[in-house]
From Swiss-Prot:
InterPro entries: RraA (IPR010203), RraA/RraA-like (IPR005493), RraA/RraA-like_sf (IPR036704)
Keywords recorded for this protein, A-Z: Lyase, Metal-binding
Name this protein carries in UniProt: Putative 4-hydroxy-4-methyl-2-oxoglutarate aldolase
One Gene Ontology biological process: regulation of RNA metabolic process
Species name: Alkalilimnicola ehrlichii (strain ATCC BAA-1101 / DSM 17681 / MLHE-1)
Coiled-coil segments on the chain, per record: none
Gene Ontology molecular function, alphabetical: 4-hydroxy-4-methyl-2-oxoglutarate aldolase activity; metal ion binding; oxaloacetate decarboxylase activity; ribonuclease inhibitor activity
Length: 161
């Protein structure tokens, strides 16, 4: 991404929602942006796998995991799948695992923390629903921009491809 989130905030403050600063970088790509696809779940990453199995086409998967600190919702295998399928990044309101391996994968990954335990796989979760966490509300089709300084979300694309 050629335009930093700080510049987007300077130029488009009225059009942006800025996430509270609680996310850490884990992926091999720190700067990423794209249209949003959402999943909402709790301690079951089946919907994450389902989404990342599809062609990403430069999208960002926003995972509302309820902020759980009891298991990981993304690891190296799912991140590699997302990278292979053309996703720009994943933002997890929850934990990830395999952090050393995640750092080697060319995919943006931001999450609250790490946890070694994998999630359950019961197939429970919602797709393309409105989610609210980190002080903002996000809808499928919004545009997310992430870099070293934070995460901002807009209703429409703010940068030229």
């Amino acid at each position: 991404m050629s335009v930093p989130t700080t510049d987007l905030c300077d130029d488009f403050a009225d059009e942006l929602r800025v996430m509270n600063p609680m996310f850490r970088d884990f992926g091999g790509r720190v700067r990423f942006h794209g249209p949003v696809t959402t999943v909402k779940l709790f301690e079951d990453n089946s919907a994450v796998r389902e989404a990342l199995s599809e062609p990403g086409e430069g999208r960002v998967l926003v995972v509302d995991g309820g902020g759980s600190m009891r298991c990981a919702l993304l690891g190296d295998n799912l991140a590699a799948l997302g990278q292979k399928n053309g996703w720009a990044g994943v933002v997890v309101y929850g934990c990830v695992r395999d952090s050393a391996e995640l750092a080697t994968i060319d995919l943006g990954v931001k999450a609250l923390n790490v946890h070694p335990l994998k999630s359950v796989k019961k197939g429970i979760g919602e797709r393309d629903v409105t989610v609210t966490f980190a002080g903002i509300t996000i809808q499928a089709g919004d545009w997310l921009y992430a870099d070293e300084d934070g995460i901002v979300v807009a209703r429409n694309s703010l940068v030229q491809a």
